[in-house]
Structures are given as C-alpha cells and as structure tokens.
Amino acid sequence: MSNQHSSTAAPSSYILDSANQPTSFDGNEQGDVNPKPLDHIRPVCNLETQMSNLPTDSVYASQPDGGLVAWLQVLGAWVLFFNTWGAMNSFGVFQTYYESGVLFDRSSSDIAWIGSIQTFCLQAMGLVAGPLYDRGGFKILIVTGSVGVVSGYMMLSLCEEFWQVLLAQGFLIGIAEGCLFTPMISILPTYFSTKIGLATGIASSGSSMGGVVYPIVMKSLMYNIGFAWTTRVLGFISLGMLLIPIIVMRERVKPALRVHRDLIDLSVFTDWPFIVFVIATMI
C-alpha cells in the first residue's frame, strides 16, 4: 500500500526541489494514508518569471502560422509598405516638379538631397525604433509614424522654399516613415514560421503598389489642382490608409519576454560578420 502511494504526485501548486527525493507515504492496514511533512517542497515560481528566463527562440516557437489575426498583420504591414517605400519610390515625380522651377529654383543635385535624406532617415531611425519596439513601443511607433507622415504632407503643402521642403519631406516624413518601417518588418516573424516567406512577400508588395499608385495620382493632380492640394490629397490618402494598421496590428510577444537592449546599442559594431554584411549591402 505504501509503495502504491509513494508515486502520488505532489499538489499542482508545488514542485519538488531537485536536491530531495519524492515524498513517501506511510499507510496502515485499513488503507489510511499519513503523509510525511513536505519540508522539501517549494512553491512554483511565477510563470512570467520563468518565461522571461527562457531563450528568445522558445518564445517564438509557437507562432500560429496563419489565422485571421496573423493575416491581418500582413494587411497592416502591406499598408505600411505602401505608405513608406511606396511613397519613396514615387519621389521622381516630386523631383521632376521641383526641377521645373515653379516652386523654387535649385539644381538637380540639390533637389536630390531631399529624397536622399528621406531615405537615410527612414533607415537610420532603426537605431532608435528597434530598441523602442523591444520595450513595448509597437503602438507608439505606429501612431507616431502615422501622425508624422500625415503632418509631413500637410506641412509640405505650405512650403515655398527649398529648405522648407527639405525639412518637411526630407526630415519629417523620412523620420516618420522610419518609425513605421521597424514595426512592420518585426511583427510578422512573431506570427508566422513556415509561411513567413509568403507573408513577407505579400506585405512587401505594398511598396511596389505604392510606387505605381502614388505617381499616377500625383501626375493626374499636380497640374490640375496645384502642388499644395496634391500633397494634401496624399496626406488624406495616407491618413485613411494608416488607420488600418493602427486598428488591426497588435503585438503577440509581450515586451517582458523579449531580450531588452540599450536605446542606442553600439555593441553591434563589434560584430565583424555583421559589419561586413552591412558594408556589402551598402556596396
């Protein structure tokens, strides 16, 4: 009888200390069981504490790899690609208009700085947006970036000088797009595993679609309603579309389960394979 009860599991709210043996029980002939004091049993530690100590890979091990919520993230990312890289791909229309001298008189090389700074800000913002995302700033980045893009277009509609356009389109819109870029490429791997290639491909096609739609809209409106109202229309289009990711996109992996890093992490510059990769990408 005692042997039969010796294998009885401890209550679910306790686990055995690895330094001790399982509890044994003494029973009499009538089948009464008198357990020994459970001195060597300790309470289960908090689940969140246990999970936070797990390797990062284990947190991503249970991606749903599909489902309505997962594909809504793809839709949201598609919209973000449309309004970031898609808008960036249409800068040639802006440059052609600026070179016409209607708004200001500057050389082509000077005008090219607007698009170059916009592209630089979009990618350089990853230095700050990445750690903010890891600290749970997903929604903050999405909302801030969306407001910045819309505000940038509205400010651009008021510009009459080169330096004003440089600030509104190059810096403001560029930084705002950088706030959107990091979340949209970071969220999909938390929802997909085997279908991550398909999901990323669908989402990134938004940049190509934006590069087709934006130039058509701009060419149709620029010489009919003027530069100011054309950029305002772009702002209204962005406002309507960017409400979609704000509403449907959500974090699946909680910030407490992520690996935190400094806001500006300079340790990456000690990773020589990564540095070589970055240099090769630049070339």
UniProtKB/Swiss-Prot annotation:
<feature type="transmembrane region" description="Helical">
    <location>
        <begin position="196"/>
        <end position="216"/>
    </location>
</feature>
<dbReference type="GO" id="GO:0016020">
    <property type="term" value="C:membrane"/>
</dbReference>
<protein>
    <recommendedName>
        <fullName>MFS-type transporter eupM</fullName>
    </recommendedName>
</protein>
<dbReference type="InterPro" id="IPR020846">
    <property type="entry name" value="MFS_dom"/>
</dbReference>
<keyword id="KW-0813">Transport</keyword>
<dbReference type="InterPro" id="IPR011701">
    <property type="entry name" value="MFS"/>
</dbReference>
<feature type="transmembrane region" description="Helical">
    <location>
        <begin position="136"/>
        <end position="156"/>
    </location>
</feature>
<keyword id="KW-0472">Membrane</keyword>
<dbReference type="InterPro" id="IPR050327">
    <property type="entry name" value="Proton-linked_MCT"/>
</dbReference>
<keyword id="KW-0812">Transmembrane</keyword>
<comment type="similarity">
    <text>Belongs to the major facilitator superfamily. Monocarboxylate porter (TC 2.A.1.13) family.</text>
</comment>
<feature type="transmembrane region" description="Helical">
    <location>
        <begin position="227"/>
        <end position="247"/>
    </location>
</feature>
<dbReference type="InterPro" id="IPR036259">
    <property type="entry name" value="MFS_trans_sf"/>
</dbReference>
<dbReference type="Pfam" id="PF07690">
    <property type="entry name" value="MFS_1"/>
</dbReference>
<feature type="transmembrane region" description="Helical">
    <location>
        <begin position="165"/>
        <end position="185"/>
    </location>
</feature>
<feature type="transmembrane region" description="Helical">
    <location>
        <begin position="68"/>
        <end position="88"/>
    </location>
</feature>
<comment type="function">
    <text>MFS-type transporter; part of the gene cluster that mediates the biosynthesis of eupenifeldin, a bistropolone meroterpenoid that acts as an antitumor agent.</text>
</comment>
<dbReference type="GO" id="GO:0022857">
    <property type="term" value="F:transmembrane transporter activity"/>
</dbReference>
<feature type="transmembrane region" description="Helical">
    <location>
        <begin position="263"/>
        <end position="283"/>
    </location>
</feature>
<keyword id="KW-1133">Transmembrane helix</keyword>
<feature type="transmembrane region" description="Helical">
    <location>
        <begin position="111"/>
        <end position="131"/>
    </location>
</feature>
